[in-house]
Amino acid sequence: MFTSLRFLCFGNTPLPSLNSSRSPQRTPSLGSSSTSSLSPIEEELATPSTPESNDSGLTLSSSIGPYPIPSSLMREVESIRSHILQQKSRHQNQPSRRHKQKNRRQRLQEVAIKQSIASSIREKAKPIATPTCYYDVSSPYAEDTSVFELNPAGEKNTNEEEEFGIASQHDWDEMINPHYNYLGAQEQIWDGDLDSSAYWGLDDLISQGYFETYDNSSVVCHPKQDANTDESYSISKALTISRNVKQPNGDTGWWLVKHVDPRALSKLGSDCVIL
């Protein structure tokens, strides 16, 4: 009864006999390893294998117990291991989400400060009044190109005597049309004594964007040569440009001028000084 219970609990491996002094010695001694009765599989299992190690904490072994791993499987495992290492390194090098949000807030604050400064500068540089007429000498109507200014009533300031026979007021639609030019070459612009040669070549400067009404300074040009080939501009005269001039009759006009560029003025053969 005891024997059958012994086989039931431990399988086919019998327990050592009580009289073990008469059973053969299965454990090899230290000096007789060559006479060991262990099978090759048992020796392989008993011998600890030394796996290949790396700094990442992942280990690779070329065999599982006594069975070698195929080279194709080893290459696949190595590929997976390299991919894991790359992902781990990339994750460590990337800044955290909180750090990204902090940098983004800083950039937005810098942009907001710059925009507020730029807005303040633009507000200070904004002219008191916007020119009420537009001008484009590149239009097919711009055969005779002159500069004109408007008074607050929307009327073009001309010589009261109209010695050139030009009307003092034109159709408003024509005034605000940027592709229309109706002025004569010698048309008087200022009233009274302030109409001296204001029609000299300023149209060329305006058409190329060289003036802007943004401050109270005046630009005085002493032409060395004619800015136009038209005979009506053949007389060389001084030209004074001012942003806001009060006429003798009380009218206040605005020049349609843009940005001052000394290089552009020199190309036109003029010596200009910003006063």
Curated annotation (Swiss-Prot):
Bias (Basic residues): 88-106
Extent of Polar residues compositional bias: 14-26, 47-60
Lineage, opening ranks: Eukaryota, Fungi, Dikarya, Ascomycota, Pezizomycotina
Record-given protein name: Transcription regulator AOL_s00215g275
Signal peptide: none
Primary role: Regulatory protein; part of the gene cluster that mediates the biosynthesis of sesquiterpenyl epoxy-cyclohexenoids (SECs) such as anthrobotrisins and arthrosporols, metabolites that possess a novel hybrid carbon skeleton consisting of a polyketide-derived epoxycyclohexenol combined with a terpenoid-derived monocyclic sesquiterpenol substructure (PKS-PTS hybrid). The SEC pathway plays an important role for fungal soil colonization via decreasing fungal nematode-capturing ability.
Biased composition (Low complexity): 27-40
Top-level taxon of the source organism: Eukaryota
Disulfide-linked positions: none
Record region (Disordered): 13-65, 84-108
Induction entry: Expression is down-regulated by the HOG1-MAPK pathway downstream transcription factor MSN2.
Consequences of knocking out this gene: Displays significantly decreased fungal growth on nutrient-rich media, while no significant difference in fungal growth was observed on nutrient-deficient medium. Displays also distinct fungal colonies with different morphology with much less dense and thick aerial mycelia. Leads to a 204.4% increase in conidial formation and a 7.6% increased germination rate. Shows slightly decreased trap formationand exhibits significantly decreased nematicidal activity.
Organism: Arthrobotrys oligospora (strain ATCC 24927 / CBS 115.81 / DSM 1491)
